Amino acid sequence: MAKLLIIDTALEEAIVALSKDGKIIAELTNKETHSHANFIQVAIAQLLATQKLDIKEIDAIAVTLGPGSYTGLRVGLASAKGIAYTLQKPLIGLSTLSALAFTAIKLVPKKMEQPFQIFSMIDARRMEIFGAIYDAVCNPILPEQAIVLDESKWNSLIHQPTICIGNGITKTKEIKVAQKVIYLDAMYTSQELVEMAMIKWNAGHFEDLAYVGPNYLKEVYIIPSK
């Protein structure tokens, strides 16, 4: 069965993990946002050593493409592409918003009113979020996009009972809405990432190394150093 290397540096906490047969067998995390780049290589070496694996035994590399931290996305994808290219292994791209929806489905109250939708949201500073809406089986309803939240916009998106998940939910709790809303104070874990990655692995859905890039959802402005 497939052995995967999972790299996630999209958000504040970075994750590097190894999986086998769709289950996490080892992982390391790093909460120091500014050191994610150094953490990745050190973590990979440590995990391979503890599992007595050679990196050539890895069947594919899975990496979060975003949305999330611009810098985090760049360093994570650069590392993943470098490994995939060197080893000639497939690269699997993962969405952070889809991962949140995948997580929400596991946490949905059993008596949740049907039908319902899942609103994944990641903090994008000020009153803006990166968001997407999914149905009860993770099919997209509203495509991933940057959203400026206000009462009018919020109510235009909530047409039915809604489960909100992600670190952007704090921006919505005080906004009045007509529909029932449940807030899940949760984030995805490495296990959700590997389960999503295995779906793509089994389907043969891999990224083209020449063209894949971070999914920023917003234009990136880089200020030249003086």
Question: Which ranges hold each PLM region?
Answer:
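N-terminal beta-alpha supersecondary unit
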Residues: 1-65
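Surface "functional belts" at beta-alpha junctions
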Residues: 23, 90-186, 216, 221-222
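Residues at secondary-structure transition points
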Residues: 31-39, 70, 74, 78, ...
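Stable alpha-helical structural segments in soluble proteins, enriched in small hydrophobic residues
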Residues: 47-51, 86, 104, 190-201
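DPxDG-like acidic metal-binding loop motif
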Residues: 60-96
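Acyltransferase
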Residues: 183-226
